[in-house]
Amino acid sequence: MKRNIFKTILLSACILQGGSALAQQEKAEPGKFSPTWESLSQYEVPEWFRNAKFGIWAHWGPQCQPEAGDWYGRGMYEEGGAAYKWHLEHYGHPSEFGFKDVINEWKAEKWNPERLVALFKKTGARYFFAMGNHHDNMDLWDSKYQSWNSVNMGPKRNVLGEWEKAARKNKLPFGVSIHSSHAWTWYETAQGADKKGPYAGISYDARVVTKEDGKGKWWEGYDPQELYVQNHALSGHAWVAWDWPEGTSVPPQSYYDNFFDRTVDMINKYHPDLVYFDDSVLPFWPINDTGLKVVSHYYNQNMKLHKGNLNAVVFGKKLEAKHKEAIVWDVEKGVPSECQDKAWQTCSCLGTWHYNRSAYEDNWYKSAETVIHMLIDIVSKNGNLLLSVPMKGNGTIDDKEEKILEDIAAWMEVNGEGIFDTRPWCIYGEGPSTETAIPLDGAGFNEGKNAPYTSADIRFVKKGKYLY
C-alpha cells in the first residue's frame, strides 16, 4: 500500500509538471467559420442528409471483447457490479488485469469491413458510421496523439481507415463518432480499490501503474496514464458529473489540446462526412471552447474539399435553440413528441451499444418491426434514424442480427419510396400514439415508454406532389 501511495504522488507530480508543456499541435483550417456560436449559426443542413433518413452504426471497439454490454471499461472497476463480477471470473482482479489488458485481448480476427458495410447498404442504410474512440480513450486509427490506438495494439489494424475505405467503395457517406472527452471522469472508478475481501485496499491499476511497470510485458514502452488519465482529483458527485462543470474535476489545458489534436488528426486523415460527439452540446461545453474550435475547423475544411459547398454534418445532444442553428440535434434512444422544424437524428441500437451476449441468448434485440415503426415515426417528424448493430469483439455480428437486417431490407425494398427523399407534411400523424406526449429525459431516453403502435396509428410524409 505504501508503494502504491508513493507512486500515486509521483505520478500526480509528473502530470502537473508536464500538463502545460504539450501545447496544441494541429492548426485550425481558416475560412468562413470561426469558433463562436454566432459564426457557426451560418450552417445549413445539407440536402443529402435530409434525404438519407437511415444510417447504420458500427459502435465497435475493445469494450465489445468481453461481450458483457455497455461501459465495461468503467463498470469493471465498480466493486460488486455485474461487469466487476464478470471480470473477476474471466480475467482476474482489476488491480492486476486492468482495462489496458482487455485491449490486448481484442484481436478482431474475423472482421471483414467490406462485407459488413455492403450488408448495411443492402439493409437500406444511406450513410454509415464507425466509432473513432469511446470513453475508454483508445483511438481506433493510426493516431498521432494517442499511442494507445488500434494500429499499435489490439487488432493492430487501422480500424477507422478500413471502415472508411469500405464506406467509400459502397458509395455511402462516412461518419465517425467521438466519445473520448469524457475519459477524464468516466475512468474515475478506476482510481479506487475494493473495500472488502482479499483485495481490500489494493489500488486498481489505473491510478498507480506506470510506464516503467510495463518492462517485459505486452505493453512495454506504453504509458498506461496516457490511456487512463486518472492522476487528478475525483469529481464531486459521482456520475452526476457527465455535464461540465456539474461537480466535475476540471481538466488542464493540455487535456483539451490533446482532444483537439486527436480529433483534428482524424478529420484531416479520413475527411468524414458526418461527426458525432457523444456530449451535451459539444465536447467540454460550456467550460471550454475546444468543441467549437473543432467544428469550425471541420466546416472550413469540408468547404475547401467541396469547392465552397458545406456538405458536413455535426451532431450534439441536449441542444438549445441557438445550438440547433449550428449543429444537428441528436436524441439518444428517444424521439420528440412533435415534428421538428430542423433536421435531427435519433441514435439507437438493436441491443446494447457494446455487444452483450445476454441480448442474444435471452432474445431481447429489437425486432425488425420495432425498428421500422421507429423509423416511420422519426421520418414523419423530420428526423433520421442512426441504428447501431452491435458487433462481437472478433468483428462479426450474430445470426439473429443478420436476420433482423434481412427483414428490414425486405421491407425497405417494397416501402423505401415512402421513406427516402421525403419531407414532413402539415401534420406528422394521427392515432392513439399521438394523443399522449412522452417527454424526453435529458439527452433522450423515452424509447419504449409509449404504448405499442396499432393499425390506427398513421404517419404522413410528402415527396413532391405525393402524400405517403
Give the location of each predicted region.
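Bacterial Sec-dependent N-terminal signal peptides
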Residues: 1-26
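Mature catalytic domains of secreted/periplasmic carbohydrate-active enzymes
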Residues: 24-468
